[in-house]
Amino acid sequence: MGDLLVFVLSGLVSGALYALLATGLVLSYSASGLFNFAHGATAYLCALTFYELHSGLGWPAVPAALLVVFVLAPALGWGLDRLMFRRLARVGETAQIVATIGLLVALPAAGLWVVELLEDAGAPVKPAENQFGLPGVGPSPAKSWQLADGVGIDSDQLITWVVTAVVAVALWVLLRHTRLGLQLRAAVDNRSLTELRGISADRLSSVAWMIASGLAGLAGVLATPLLGLSAHDFTLFLFVSATAAVIGRFASVPLAFAGGLGLGVLQNLVAGYASFAESITGFRTAVPFLILFGGLLVLTRRARTAGVAAVDAPPVDHLAGASWGRRWGVWAVGAGLLCVAFYTVTTPFWSGLLAQGLAIALVFMSFTVVTGLGAMVSLAQGTFVTGAALVAGLLMSRGWPFVAALAVGTCVAALLGALVALPALRLGGRTLALATLALAFLADQVLFQLRWLRNGDSGWSIPRPVFGPVDLSDDRALGVALVILVALVAAGLSALRDSPSGRAMLAVRSAPAAAVASGVSVLRTKLLLFTLSAGLAGFGGVMYASYNTRITATDFTAMTGLVWLAVVVAAGVRRPQYAVVAGLVFALAPRVLADYVTESAHLPVILFGLAGLALANDPDGYCAAVPVRLAKRRAALVPAGPSPTPPLPETGLRPDPSGAPDPDPPPATAGGTPSASNAGGAEFALRANQPRQADDTGQDPAPPAFEEWGSPHDGVLGEGLGRSPRSPAGGAPPALELRGVTAGYDGGLVLHGVDLVVRAGEILAVLGPNGAGKSTACRVAAGLLPVENGTVHVQGRDATRDGAVLRSRAGVVLAPEGRGIFPSLTIEENLALYLKEADARAAVYDRFPRLGERRGVPAGALSGGEQQMLALAPLLQLPPRVLIADEPSLGLAPRIVDGVYALLTELRDAGTALLLVEEKAAEILGIADTVAYLSQGRVSWCGPRAEVEEDRLTEAYLGMGT
């Protein structure tokens, strides 16, 4: 019983640290969608700072800890968010993973380099070595208390428990009982919808990163007595705590916190009671990684992939279709010059460095296969390199020839890659990266500790081969041989990419569901990618070990593989020739820096790590960015011709019989007067065919308001709902106006010179088929999508440069396609985001009793009609100046649609300008004042509702016009 209590208590200490780190991971991921692999490095940097302030400069422990946790760590999080994380949130997941891994590499090295510089300058700092038994926040030495026979705790453990409990309560209060916490949880659900509600997602991101970094700093300070100043141990702590973040689904702080505590206890219990594994060398130290890998497999849900394309689609190949000389000429000339240089220009020293770079380039090209072709991030490449080299060394010690040992080592690495891939392939993205890293650590701790394989600390000798008269012990001969090998491998990978198998790999990368529909086996393709990549890494590993003439089990650890990944992806991972550049840079840069900048070993590591920062701007790497920039420069020199005008669709508008063009056609507007087509320039004479029937008062009838949606006049309504400014005062500017707007995505234009006007108290219905650009127009009007050309005006003010937050604060509200609600928030919390006052929310419940009865229910549990009711209800209480509704009837029953339209007409009568996008033209025409038809990104026509011919409009939708 005493042993059990000891295991539990000590496990709660490490569990508390796991909980703090996991909570920070969840907060930062929730705010930005970014998993921060450098979270443990932040903790280490804070621990190092605390140690130097306390032990070096002599500061008292508590003030030093407070400065680190509440000032320096949040400042670091804020700075990284502004410089890096915000931009990374908009790139593909591969670039996100690699960039944060680069930061993981760079931050500890940066801290150690600063300590070196301060020490050289004479500052009273202490060497930052892997010291243990360092003082913490409490008394030094730590005080101890005996709770029972053989069971004790010390002051450092007690402080860790108390502080962790206080942090848990503080986080619960922040997230559940403050408006900031509500906004943070809303950003977790839907970042863009948060901005559409006037809440700055960037500000929330900064706050979340500051809190997350503060928690990492707190974990670092508390862990100093336990872990010392070992960057490696802090990194391992981070990766184990990721299991707790998985328990919380990267969304729930309480679950992640509890998971961290339980993880620490479980780790100790397994290590303490797994007597069956006592004979396995390294098992106890490998327990955290077993738990991490098992947790990832069990807890990670398989994401739905149907209909989803990869977000990191390959860049445009500007040399597609070019001749061989244009595509490969520069690289072939470079290879030839390098071969000549080995025997004419370079010294033996530089010949050796170049040969080393070419050898490591073979390893780097394995990333081209698994990440460049497969979009999978493997962090186990160092394991494949070590495994192949150890096997080759073992065989050569038994008298095997080099070529045979190389072949067997390559096959062993390929087999090891297949074994790693089989359990991990059900994962993807960050979870696959974490799973492969866990297996890499397991190999380091268990597999490569086998005595017969590692041959002690000295390892195995791998002499360079001799092929007839060619002795590769000469660095020059080895360099030329490696140039030939690298060229052959690069040519083979390029041929693979262009082969049917390569196209299948690219299909699986871009759209797995579509690949399956085409008869491609996703599992078999991914397994092939992993196996081929591991085999290539093993082949390169044996050649690299041959260059060094020896291999040990610690030459290429899992952490080494992280540095490799950062270097090769920063250069460009999609093409094998970019991996060659990365290999040469990796070999030559440290020597160049040592000769011309500094001899510190930390600076090259910093630069290699910070190379990942460039991925925020060039996610495909700096080598891949060169042809893109050259192509843009060439395109800028070519004058652009006039863009072709698509033919106008058949509509309910009849062209002027004279056919005479208007010499100065006015823009197509939504102001109620006939306008010319801004696509063709021909003036249309709008003629009535089926006008709406007016009632005795001359007003257009609205659809019936159903009882469950509330009466338009019962309850307490928002200010101004009695107004009916259907005819605004002369000279009043439009509520919303788009003038000549051109916009699109990733350089592809969707809207071409769109002009739309909507006035207060008016409904503009925008119609058009799928792909016409209706939703894009909504995003532009709401500020979610910037314009390429043209302007957007709100109440007569130029708001073109305003984002969604400023547009929302100016009174422009977008109800996006689907449901504009936050699914995991309750009805009360959804309303509170828009209506701060309790009286306003009470008025909504009076108006919509069904919402009041279920105010504590998560919005995601409501029916489609109830969700749309929830989205519109606060707008009735506090009417916006402009409401943009994208497909408000989508997925709703006809009876519910009538209720939605009744609420929309009520908003119109309250003075709100409405821009409604619908595909169901028949329904929307019943409430519209003005109609615009969008086709191929252009406003084909626009005019009053009474002048729309519904039969011809139907023909236009169905493509039946003559």
Identify what each model region corresponds to.
Residues G40-A43, R90-L134, D149-D156, D202, ...:
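Transmembrane alpha-helices and adjacent helix-loop boundaries
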Residues G790-A799, A810, A838-D846, W941-G943:
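Conserved ABC transporter NBD signature motif
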